[in-house]
Amino acid sequence: MQFAKRLEKIPPYLFAEINRKREALIAKGVDIINIGVGDPDKPTPAHILQAMREAIDDASNHNYPPYEGTQEFREAAVEWMERRFGVMDLNPNTEVVSSIGSKEAIHNTFLAFVEAGDYTLIPDPGYPVYRTSTIFAGGEAFSMPLKAENKFLPDLDLIPEEVARKAKMLWINYPNNPTGALATLEFFEELVALCQQYSILLCHDHAYSEMAYDGYKPPSVLQIPGAKDIAIEFHSLSKSYNMTGWRIGFAVGNAYAIKGLSQVKTNVDSGVFKAIQKAAIAAYATDEVELQAVMSVYQSRRDIIVKGLQSLGWPIEPPKATLYVWVPVPPGYTSTEFTTLLLDKCGIVVPPGVGYGASGEGYFRVALTISDERLHEAIQRMQDAGIRYA
């Protein structure tokens, strides 16, 4: 028995490795503070749970769901896009498809459009799935470095002409994981123009669309005139509604891109449990006040981490979005060396920036997914261990 050769090209999945290391230390009796994985610790809101309970009791939801999602779910997604972003004229029958979270839809989009020898343009640092899915599809990933001096936006002028001509997809993710960076509508306009020029499918991973603070409201790339000609956007309920375990989201945008994604999906999965789709519909109807109450929890945690690290000399500012704080390592350390130091001396688990790509070197990521008390304790442990930025 032998693995396929493609698996030899796949590095260990970052978060799985972090979890294994954490479990090994816990087995030894170490009190671990895990701020390494973006998995919200709060419960799913009560009205969503109630919608799920009612849907489970309805026997009509117990059979196979439509591959593309129920009509009711797709219409709710379209209505939410209109209400949230002002994106009008989306067709729920041809321009929306349900997904098992956004991760599977992202991966299956690579399978639908990338062939051997094709380039994918991916952010670096970035969600590891962009690179591994390129490998699974037989393509070649071209990294677009995200640098602090460019506000963690890719410099589109650095994409060589020969690469752009062979590129099938360009991936972006704003608000950004892991950097917490933001993108403007003006930047989206530049992306749309580039992708139109080279007939590249523009793919926007919008998993953190609602994870924003200080009054900021992240835009959709589909707000740009003409974007729907070349763009697909991926939405997930996982982070915004504390529903990571539910596995529900949708892809929306260009009808041809949705058709390709749907064709892969109909051959590899059987859709999302209809009761979960009912719960998702309730989630998209969540009152803005209630959603902001959820966000206020993460904003408080952000402030604890930022102020705590600032007190230890870190030159950082509070991010306006996502579940993460992107933090430079102290001078003289690599990201792996410093995160190992935090684990060994403080029992704190954080991922090294290099795990998100070569351009992530020099940083580590803090996830705002544990209680205020444990975040304060993490800062105290660092202080007690004499760990400072400089």
Swiss-Prot record:
Its EC number is 2.6.1.83. Its cofactor is pyridoxal 5'-phosphate. Substrate binds at Y13, G38, K103, Y127, N177, R365. Pathway: Amino-acid biosynthesis; L-lysine biosynthesis via DAP pathway; LL-2,6-diaminopimelate from (S)-tetrahydrodipicolinate (aminotransferase route): step 1/1. Gene3D superfamilies: Aspartate Aminotransferase, domain 1, Type I PLP-dependent aspartate aminotransferase-like (Major domain). Pyridoxal 5'-phosphate binds at Y67, S102, K103, Y127, N177, Y208, S236, L237, S238, R247. The modification N6-(pyridoxal phosphate)lysine is found at K239. CDD domains: AAT_like. GO terms for molecular function: L,L-diaminopimelate aminotransferase activity; pyridoxal phosphate binding. InterPro entries: Aminotransferase_I/II_large (IPR004839), DapL/ALD1 (IPR019942), LL-DAP_aminotransferase (IPR050881), NHTrfase_class1_PyrdxlP-BS (IPR004838), PyrdxlP-dep_Trfase (IPR015424), PyrdxlP-dep_Trfase_major (IPR015421), PyrdxlP-dep_Trfase_small (IPR015422). One of its GO terms (biological process) is lysine biosynthetic process via diaminopimelate, diaminopimelate-aminotransferase pathway. Pfam families: Aminotran_1_2. Keywords: Aminotransferase, Pyridoxal phosphate, Transferase. Involved in the synthesis of meso-diaminopimelate (m-DAP or DL-DAP), required for both lysine and peptidoglycan biosynthesis. Catalyzes the direct conversion of tetrahydrodipicolinate to LL-diaminopimelate. Homodimer. PANTHER family: AMINO ACID AMINOTRANSFERASE, L-GLUTAMINE--4-(METHYLSULFANYL)-2-OXOBUTANOATE AMINOTRANSFERASE. Belongs to the class-I pyridoxal-phosphate-dependent aminotransferase family. LL-diaminopimelate aminotransferase subfamily. NCBIfam families: PRK09276.1. This is LL-diaminopimelate aminotransferase 2. It comes from Nostoc sp. (strain PCC 7120 / SAG 25.82 / UTEX 2576). The gene is dapL2.
